[in-house]
Amino acid sequence: MGRAKKVVLAYSGGVDTSVCIPYLKQEWGVEEVITLAADLGQGDELEPIREKALKSGASESLVADVKDSFVKDYAFGAIQANALYENRYPLGTALARPLIAKILVETAEKYGADAIAHGCTGKGNDQVRFDVSVTALNPNLKILAPAREWGMSREETIAYGEKFGIPSPVKKSSPYSIDKNLLGRSIEAGLLEDPSFEPPEEIYEMTKAIADTPNEPEYIKIGFHGGIPTTLNGIAKQPVELIEELNQLVGNHGVGRIDMIENRLVGIKSREIYESPAMLVLIQAHRDLESLTLTADVTHYKRGIEETYSQIVYNGLWYSPLKVALDAFIQKTQERVSGTVRVKLFKGNSTIVGRSSDSSLYTPDLATYGADDQFDHKAAEGFIYVWGLPTRIWSRQIKS
């Protein structure tokens, strides 16, 4: 008896998910495999991917265009939260997983499948993100993860697929693993597993090498409403359009590359290369606008929330009660985070050079050191006396 009768497989067209199709049927006795590819703006031609799934043995191959939802329901929330895992990674891949899990569950329920399958290995974070999200949305569905159990190396996986006529775009001599969507690219494996090895220029696609970037800076203006980016250079943009244009503008100046040693949820460290031009600049600009529009105590408290939020997303807990609670707090803080941020792009750097907002808490006649200064300097002495009182009492006590 097989492990499941009908399975919906998260499908990318890559090596692992393609090999999963014959493996599920031949090794695990699955009768029917339905593949589901999510169009997350990865730029691939999806019809060839759909055809590849059918040629690999899928009974049906589906494609879901979820780009708009990906940006509005996932990326924008992360921007409002200034979410950077370990203060560097803007979670482009991690944000896609709960959305993919959601449409997998919806498809399984529609087609009467009894299991969900994915091609994640046992060393990565994605297995956690998929499994936890699926069980949160429908705990009655089984989860099958062939790559977690089959024990094949990447080279052996490629060879297994070739036995069933599955071609691989990955060169056996340099097997980089690449994941791409609208928010960015992640590159790992191969020569990159040596943390001292400088990444070759050939791995990058969304960002130019510094030597190839323009010799003059470019200035852009990003407009926010309620913490959500809505305009670029004064022109209103649809969510997907905004991300696409920013990726092009920012990447053209070599901005958006990340090379980091990352702490994975499964307990190991991994060398990861990311390209995420739009998200990095949007978070940078959004955080700057918050400094203009939020009070000091809210700003400082929210910084701690942001770290927790990024860990929750990274660790696959998008549908957890804590995530829901943090969302409520973050949304409340964003009510007055509206305005425009001016960014200078030049030779791999993005620099905030100006910001403005109708909700600005910056008061020129209190901040100035000029003749228009309205700050009550005499009041400072009494404030300092009260502020420092606990410290003086403590000091007297330990010295007595």
Swiss-Prot record:
Which Pfam family, any one, appears in the UniProt record? Arginosuc_syn_C
Q: Does the keyword Ligase apply?
A: yes
GO cellular component term, pick one: cytoplasm
Per UniProt, where does ATP bind?
10-18, 38, 119
Keywords, sorted A to Z? Amino-acid biosynthesis, Arginine biosynthesis, ATP-binding, Cytoplasm, Ligase, Nucleotide-binding
MF GO annotations: argininosuccinate synthase activity; ATP binding
Pathway(s) it belongs to: Amino-acid biosynthesis; L-arginine biosynthesis; L-arginine from L-ornithine and carbamoyl phosphate: step 2/3
Query: Could you provide one GO biological process annotation from this protein's UniProt record?
Result: L-arginine biosynthetic process
User: In which residues is L-citrulline bound?
Assistant: 89, 125, 129, 177, 186, 262, 274
Subunit and partners = Homotetramer.
Give the family from UniProt. Belongs to the argininosuccinate synthase family. Type 1 subfamily.
**Which HAMAP family does the entry mention?**
Arg_succ_synth_type1
| Name of this protein | Argininosuccinate synthase
The organism is Nostoc punctiforme (strain ATCC 29133 / PCC 73102)
